[in-house]
Amino acid sequence: MAAEPQPSSLSYRTTGSTYLHPLSELLGIPLDQVNFVVCQLVALFAAFWFRIYLRPGTTSSDVRHAVATIFGIYFVIFCFGWYSVHLFVLVLMCYAIMVTASVSNIHRYSFFVAMGYLTICHISRIYIFHYGILTTDFSGPLMIVTQKITTLAFQVHDGLGRRAEDLSAEQHRLAIKVKPSFLEYLSYLLNFMSVIAGPCNNFKDYIAFIEGKHIHMKLLEVNWKRKGFHSLPEPSPTGAVIHKLGITLVSLLLFLTLTKTFPVTCLVDDWFVHKASFPARLCYLYVVMQASKPKYYFAWTLADAVNNAAGFGFSGVDKNGNFCWDLLSNLNIWKIETATSFKMYLENWNIQTATWLKCVCYQRVPWYPTVLTFILSALWHGVYPGYYFTFLTGILVTLAARAVRNNYRHYFLSSRALKAVYDAGTWAVTQLAVSYTVAPFVMLAVEPTISLYKSMYFYLHIISLLIILFLPMKPQAHTQRRPQTLNSINKRKTD
């Protein structure tokens, strides 16, 4: 009896469109990745068209909302097929909460429904679809929508359910005084610029963009007259888009070469685990983790360029008078690669997710904000065991790094030479620490993670624990935190 024919590649294992399968076969790239890139490139051209031909001055806000939503829905269905139903169900459930829930509870209900649904989908990908390796990863858009749903719910709660004097300055600026219409809600969550790869953004900024007030609003915030402009300028995003597309192209080339040469599976092969020396393992781990970055640089920078091409993402004017289009930037590659502290690295990686975590968790929880923020970040990313190894290790490293900095940094500030030595040393330590910490994040499963850490003798865990145990830490109050509000600021001024 003849054996059942096997598919020629894994590229058919997708619920999205198979129209581009010949291109997938030609390039040797999985079909879901081809669909993603093609959708983002089409979105880029659509964004230019959207900005030029559907300008706010000549096109109503409703039309702009509708077009952005229709394109977004089409892209989601093209990439994910029937899996896109999960996205639409979550959006509709949370809009029902937006309409029916009281403003005092709207943020709680939205948060638990969105995070709960996302977690169920994460679990199904692991335990039903076996880590999702042979199926399209539909969780990406769901994660972005979850961020937007919860961000909007908290900002509506701030605007309608809290007193102005109880808000921080940032919460006051972003508070929403009127619940969005159904069209505005759909457009904010499903617009074609960010539905596939993000990033998350604030509802006020998005509505200002749709209504044509986004750039002027940002210029007024930075006081454009003091920047040397005699009339209100009209900055073009074209230069920023070209620059970001250049970064995208370089990232793609690195992904096709470096990432293929140093796959993460190298970290569990026989040579690495049993034969390589410890210094060789340190260096090789760093190289492999560096090689895993270009795909993130590519996806996030391209998503940023798409938003900019549509005219969204203007952040103001820098100190040199240059227009900045980094409001939605998700990373700062230079600061990542030159980071001299764990904190600096994290602040410049997945920036919009860090902003979301700060908005819905860190600034609001009364106890243990760092630990709870790490836990929320892990839950949002998924339920792969590797994520939890990364975030638990990250908590240890963060606390240890804080202790070292507080106890020793001031000794190196007396001269430029000492500061240079300190910066060089902390750069090397930071890069090695990040490589060690994030390796489980890309390995996903328990067995390869334990194998890697055993081969590294759990060195960073041990060092971090020793530092935490034996170096004096700044005393942390375990009583309820009091976030800085407009009321507390005004009270301090009058004291």
From Swiss-Prot:
InterPro entries: LPLAT_7/PORCN-like (IPR049941), MBOAT_fam (IPR004299)
Pfam families according to UniProt: MBOAT
Membrane spanning stretches: 34-54, 70-90, 126-146, 180-200, 238-258, 297-317, 371-391, 426-446, 450-470
Single GO biological process annotation from the record: phospholipid biosynthetic process
Cellular component terms (Gene Ontology): endoplasmic reticulum membrane; membrane
Positions where Phosphoserine occurs in the chain: S488
Tissue specificity field: Expressed in neutrophils.
Membrane topology: Multi-pass membrane protein
Keywords annotated in UniProt: Acyltransferase, Endoplasmic reticulum, Lipid biosynthesis, Lipid metabolism, Membrane, Phospholipid biosynthesis, Phospholipid metabolism, Phosphoprotein, Transferase, Transmembrane, Transmembrane helix
Activity modulation notes: Partially inhibited by thimerosal.
Pathway, per record: Lipid metabolism; phospholipid metabolism
Top EC class for this record: transferase
EC number: 2.3.1.-, 2.3.1.23, 2.3.1.n7, 2.3.1.n6
Catalysed reaction equations from the record: a 1-acyl-sn-glycero-3-phospho-L-serine + an acyl-CoA = a 1,2-diacyl-sn-glycero-3-phospho-L-serine + CoA; a 1-acyl-sn-glycero-3-phosphocholine + an acyl-CoA = a 1,2-diacyl-sn-glycero-3-phosphocholine + CoA; a 1-acyl-sn-glycero-3-phosphoethanolamine + an acyl-CoA = a 1,2-diacyl-sn-glycero-3-phosphoethanolamine + CoA; 1-(9Z-octadecenoyl)-sn-glycero-3-phospho-L-serine + (9Z)-octadecenoyl-CoA = 1,2-di-(9Z)-octadecenoyl-sn-glycero-3-phospho-L-serine + CoA
Location of this chain's protein in the cell: Endoplasmic reticulum membrane
Active site feature: N350, H381
Gene Ontology molecular function terms on file: 1-acylglycerol-3-phosphate O-acyltransferase activity; 1-acylglycerophosphocholine O-acyltransferase activity; 1-acylglycerophosphoethanolamine O-acyltransferase activity; 1-acylglycerophosphoserine O-acyltransferase activity; 2-acylglycerol-3-phosphate O-acyltransferase activity; acyltransferase activity
Function: Acyltransferase which catalyzes the transfer of an acyl group from an acyl-CoA towards a lysophospholipid producing a phospholipid and participates in the reacylation step of the phospholipid remodeling pathway also known as the Lands cycle. Acts on lysophosphatidylserine (1-acyl-2-hydroxy-sn-glycero-3-phospho-L-serine or LPS) and lysophosphatidylethanolamine (1-acyl-sn-glycero-3-phosphoethanolamine or LPE), and to a lesser extend lysophosphatidylcholine. Prefers oleoyl-CoA as the acyl donor and 1-oleoyl-LPE as acceptor. May play a role in neurite outgrowth during neuronal differentiation.
PANTHER family the UniProt entry points to: LYSOPHOSPHOLIPID ACYLTRANSFERASE 1 (PTHR13906:SF6), PORCUPINE (PTHR13906)
Protein family per UniProt: Belongs to the membrane-bound acyltransferase family.
UniProt protein name: Membrane-bound glycerophospholipid O-acyltransferase 1
Species annotation: Homo sapiens (Human)
Phylogenetic classification of the source organism: Eukaryota, Metazoa, Chordata, Craniata, Vertebrata
